[in-house]
From Swiss-Prot:
Its main location: cytoplasm. GO terms for molecular function: ferrochelatase activity; metal ion binding. Belongs to the ferrochelatase family. It comes from Shewanella denitrificans (strain OS217 / ATCC BAA-1090 / DSM 15013). It is found in: Cytoplasm. It catalyses: heme b + 2 H(+) = protoporphyrin IX + Fe(2+). Its EC number is 4.98.1.1. One of its GO terms (cellular component) is cytoplasm. It comes from the Bacteria. Fe cation binds at residues 207, 293. This is Ferrochelatase.
């Protein structure tokens, strides 16, 4: 393809990834790729690889496969199915609004997963072959974190390092305080309250990370707390009345024995129930699409924790997924770079 024909803009949506199937072998392949990323596990490389291949990949895949089986749908992995809908709806919205690039050409929307399929390398090759020379990357991690956002950038950079002709690159690294994002979160919470009534507490559960990462300079914790603060402010602006302890922030999905960001979600739910809280709603602002960590860990596992500790009503508020206001948010995020 001649360089004169390379005059197109493409948007690349990225998320973490998923096994191809809820089987032990598929989960083992996925975990091997995911847990081999030095951004994800920051301990001496040789030691970790020995632990990973000698212990974890022998034990964890079968257990995880059983959990994936519990959330698998006819469309396959919920995360992948939702991500594909996000891609299609964003493409439809850009076309409908006639949002073109600076050359007046239509913008194409693509999808890649950091681990698993569709891979970053495969998707970017397709974009390259389509003549895209202005690349806008939107990792769907609202709060920047090195293990997620920076790892997504690593994958982009690794792929581009093999190319001779590089595109212009715009990488949207965080949107934790974006007005459209906060408004979309509020709308999903308000819709639940309108349908089911006000709970006694609203728990905002974010994905956790080792506390060490915070001390090393990762802003993730601060970004999560800012998201919570802005959601509270939005709720107050919209006239919701609640006590100062109504919204609680916690962190889930801890792995290993190291100290992670606290308070932990399961411990928090147990404590709230033991204190007499009977009705709770839980939202997970760090997840742009429902996945194992929301559909199984929160909606099933942590529901049991709360009910077992004396709670009576546990409501999980779905991720923003392919909600219309979430798609508009994505469009507004990428629009300045088209």
């Amino acid at each position: 393809m001649g360089h004169t024909k390379r005059n197109k803009t493409g948007v690349l949506l990225m998320n973490l990834g998923t096994p191809d199937a809820p089987t032990t072998s598929a989960v083992r392949r996925y975990l091997a790729e995911f847990l081999s990323d030095p951004r994800v596990v920051e301990i001496p490389r040789l030691l970790w690889l020995l632990i990973l291949h000698g212990i974890i990949l022998r034990i964890r895949p079968a257990k995880s496969a059983a959990l994936y089986k519990g959330i698998w749908t006819e469309a396959g992995s919920p995360l992948l199915a939702i991500s594909e809908r996000q891609q299609a709806k964003l493409q439809g919205y850009l076309d409908e609004q006639q949002l073109t690039d600076k050359n007046g050409q239509a913008v194409s929307v693509h999808l890649a997963m950091r681990y698993g399929s569709p891979s970053v390398q495969q998707t970017m090759l397709q974009m390259h072959q389509a003549g895209i020379d202005n690349l806008v990357v939107l990792p769907l991690y609202p709060q920047y974190a090195a293990p997620t956002t920076a790892s997504a950038f690593d994958a982009i950079a690794k792929t581009l390092s093999q190319w001779r002709y590089l595109p212009s690159l715009h990488f949207i690294h965080t949107y934790h305080d974006n007005d459209d994002y906060i408004s979309a979160l509020f709308a999903s919470i308000k819709a639940d309250f309108d349908t089911n009534g006000m709970p006694e507490r609203l728990l905002l559960s974010y994905h956790g990370m080792p506390e060490r990462n915070l001390h090393l300079g990762d802003p993730y914790y601060c970004f999560c707390m800012k998201t919570t603060r802005l959601v509270i402010e939005k709720m107050q602006q919209q006239g919701l009345v609640f006590d100062s302890d109504f919204v609680v922030t916690s962190f889930q999905s801890r792995f290993g024995k190291a100290k992670w960001l606290q308070p932990y979600t399961d411990v928090t739910l147990e404590a709230l129930a033991s204190e007499g809280v009977r009705k709770i709603a839980v939202a997970c602002p760090a997840f742009s699409a429902d996945c194992l960590e929301t559909l199984e860990e929160i909606e099933q596992e942590n529901r049991e924790v709360f009910i077992h500790a004396g709670g009576e009503s546990f409501r999980y508020i779905s991720a923003l997924n392919d909600n219309d206001d979430h798609i508009v948010m994505m469009a507004n995020l990428v629009k300045p770079y088209l």
